[in-house]
A protein has these predicted regions:
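N-terminal secretory signal peptides that target proteins for export/translocation
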Residues: 1-6
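Active-site alpha-helical elements of protease catalytic centers
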Residues: 181-194, 339-351
Length: 452
């Protein structure tokens, strides 16, 4: 549990919820309000065996225990004297045999210009507004809009028409195996409901009801040197698709980033002098980490026998030239792990993948259990520059930076997720996927989030 608390701290700080410092005396009480009907969801009477520390004897009980467990983790970190209520239910959500909406959570209401509000004309989600004001600003009955969060999760998961073979893991120990860890998804979605959410329309740049929101108030675009509230709508639209250049400027978030994020991977070119310097990279989700397996060597373009001949998707023709070198390959045609494996089989000690679209380099997903060499991606523009220097004896090191944090800007502020093109439901209201270790509020579940 200690590590999971640490992984959650940065999300808390960024959500502006840790304004006074959390402590046992101030811990928030988060109450799960059961909105399910008889014999469904939390009230499902199906008998089950205890699993992973979850002692419930029915399916409904285990679901509720998992919900309350996640709520208690958040509550231990949040200083609030006002009870936080979560309207919660299990419902059939959008689902196919290959994709599914796992669940969602968000604030039920927002408040602005209340007593003790730190910023005027600024929307605050219900739980945060109540904490700051010291009173419940919207009192009322349970299971109504007087509750602070609304959470819905997919009751159909694992069924014949909804990601068959998956299903929710209801244990509290992180040992989900091939199932989907409900506690991890709950922690993420509760984060949105507690304040990790932008109210700006990312497609139009418009503010919500003509007011700024507390989350977006801290977004800073390093390209134009402006905070989001000071931008025009047109500028905000552009900023929402400015990958790697939008940071969260909150003091607590920056402090936690420096204490939690690891050092970023980088490509350091030492020769020829005309292109020497540090280049930003995207990491691979397979093979060894760059930090554990740094390599230095001459860079050689991989050549295969099928056009396009530099993507390493068919038999390599220059294996001898690649042996003991760092291979450069182009993105496209086949999976990242296939390219890296081909270079490794030819004797390469590392791989540089050149992006095939404009913009920042992305992370490389996929599975490569036999891959033992490090690999990184560089941008398309940097690829053009470095390819032009290959004939001059391009020499580089793939390693971890000594100064730059993974997932942070040059000032150490955590980056938010602003891919191009825009990803509805994911852009802006998540941390950037370049963070290492991965963070709770990234747009996808990852192995770093087990509540260990």
């Amino acid at each position: 549990m200690k590590n999971f608390f640490r992984k959650t701290c940065l999300a808390v700080a960024t959500g502006a919820l840790l304004l006074a410092g959390a402590g046992a005396a101030n811990a928030a009480t988060i109450t799960i309000v059961n909105a399910d009907g008889a014999n469904e969801g939390f009230n499902d009477p199906t008998p089950v065996l205890p699993v992973g520390g979850n002692t419930g004897t029915t399916l409904g009980q285990q679901r509720l225990i998992a919900f309350q467990f996640a709520a208690d983790v958040w509550g231990a970190l949040l200083p609030s004297a006002v009870e936080i209520r979560v309207t919660a239910s299990f419902d059939p959500l959008t689902c196919t045999t290959t994709t599914a909406v796992l669940g969602s959570a968000g604030p039920r209401t927002y408040s602005a210009d209340f007593a003790n509000a730190p910023l005027a004309a600024t929307w605050y989600p219900a739980a945060l507004a109540n904490k700051l004001s010291g009173v419940d600003l919207n009192p009322g009955a349970m299971n109504s809009t007087a509750d602070d969060l609304r959470a819905q999760f997919n009751v159909s998961l694992g069924g014949a028409t909804c990601l068959p073979g998956s299903g929710w893991y209801l244990g509290l120990d992180g040992n989900a195996g091939s199932s989907i860890n409900l506690v991890v998804v709950l922690m993420h979605e509760f984060g949105h409901g507690l304040g990790f959410i932008s109210l700006v329309n990312n497609s139009t740049g418009a503010l919500f009801s003509s007011k700024r929101d507390v989350y977006s108030n801290f977004l800073y675009d390093n390209t134009v040197g402006m905070l989001w509230p000071d931008m025009t709508s047109t500028q905000r639209v552009a900023s929402a698709i400015n990958p790697g250049n939008v940071a969260f400027t909150g003091q607590w978030a920056t402090w936690n980033a420096d204490n939690w994020l690891g050092y970023a991977s980088e490509l350091l070119v030492s020769a020829p002098a005309g292109v020497a310097g540090s280049y930003n990279v995207g990491d691979a989700g397979f093979g060894p980490t760059v930090a554990s397996t740094p390599v230095t060597g001459q860079v050689v373009l991989a050549i295969d026998d099928t056009a396009p001949t530099s993507d390493a998707c068919s038999a390599l023709q220059n294996a001898a030239a690649l042996s003991g070198k760092i291979a450069m390959v182009d993105r496209g045609t086949c999976a990242f792990a296939v390219k890296v494996q081909a270079a490794q089989d030819a004797g390469a000690i590392g791989v540089i993948v050149v992006n095939n679209v404009a913009g920042a380099p992305s992370s490389m997903g996929g599975s490569g259990p036999a891959v033992t060499i490090p690999s990184v991606m560089i941008s398309q523009a940097d690829g053009v520059t470095l390819k032009a220097a290959l004939a001059s004896g391009l020499t580089a090191t793939i390693h971890s930076s000594a100064t730059k944090r993974a997932g942070a800007d040059p000032l150490g502020r955590p980056l938010v997720y602003t891919p191009n093109p825009l990803q509805s439901g994911s852009s802006v209201s998540h941390f950037d996927t370049s963070a290492m270790p991965n963070l709770l509020m990234e747009p996808a579940i990852n192995s770093d989030l087990d509540p260990d």
